[in-house]
């Protein structure tokens, strides 16, 4: 049976919106939920990057157009976006570590939106995701990109795990998937 639930689909199809809605439904039913999501940053009608935002509301840059890497650090770039690894790790890693070491009755849900090219520049993030996948008592509700170009090792690893259910989000089904996603996460908690 699936323990972790991941959404996949093309950019802009509504994966993050579904993650938000599912998190709210789960929280309102008393499920402990923590994690982070990525959000587009726009300026003058143009996308200039992405922020990482924790469910507790802390926000920091994930990537920006034309960002200079810190002196002595290698540049991590996806298209026109330069990834701010330090900022990302400062926000995302504590959330994942909290999911790993949290005790208490019942299963916790850890939101990871997303496990994509930008996030995978961080070796510490890769290790933390693998750790969280194998932590009893933690269910991941996350997003992964659709396969395109060179496969991303961790994404393929997740996609092929027997304890993972992957929902393919499309414009046609996105308005009907929420109950299935919530039910799948809730049944993982039993």
UniProtKB/Swiss-Prot annotation:
Entry-linked Gene3D superfamilies: P-loop containing nucleotide triphosphate hydrolases (3.40.50.300)
Subunit structure: Monomer.
Entry function: Has nucleotide phosphatase activity towards ATP, GTP, CTP, TTP and UTP. Hydrolyzes nucleoside diphosphates with lower efficiency.
Entry protein name: Cancer-related nucleoside-triphosphatase
Keyword Hydrolase attributed: yes
HAMAP family recorded: NTPase_1
Spans through the membrane: none
Organism placement in taxonomy: Eukaryota, Metazoa, Chordata, Craniata, Vertebrata
SMART domains for this protein: AAA
Any Pfam family the entry gives: NTPase_1
InterPro entries assigned to the protein according to its UniProt record, in alphabetical order: AAA+_ATPase (IPR003593), Nuc-triphosphatase_THEP1 (IPR004948), P-loop_NTPase (IPR027417)
Enzyme class: hydrolase
SUPFAM superfamilies: P-loop containing nucleoside triphosphate hydrolases
A GO CC term attached to the entry: mitochondrion
């Amino acid at each position: 049976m699936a323990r972790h639930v991941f959404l996949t689909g093309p950019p802009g199809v509504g994966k993050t919106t579904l993650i938000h809605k599912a998190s709210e439904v789960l929280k309102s039913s008393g499920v402990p939920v923590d994690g982070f999501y990525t959000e587009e940053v726009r300026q003058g009608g143009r996308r200039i990057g992405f922020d990482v935002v924790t469910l507790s509301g802390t926000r920091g840059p994930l990537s920006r157009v034309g960002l200079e890497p810190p002196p002595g650090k290698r540049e991590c770039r996806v298209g026109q976006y330069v990834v701010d690894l330090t900022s990302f790790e400062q926000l995302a890693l504590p959330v994942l570590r909290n999911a790993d070491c949290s005790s208490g009755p019942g299963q916790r849900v850890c939101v990871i939106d997303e496990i994509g090219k930008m996030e995978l520049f961080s070796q510490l993030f890769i290790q933390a995701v693998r750790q969280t996948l194998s932590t009893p008592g933690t269910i991941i509700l996350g997003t992964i990109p659709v396969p395109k170009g060179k496969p991303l090792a961790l994404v393929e690893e997740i996609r092929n795990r027997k304890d993972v259910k992957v929902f393919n989000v499309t414009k046609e089904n996105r308005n009907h998937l929420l109950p299935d996603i919530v039910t799948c996460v809730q049944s993982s908690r039993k």
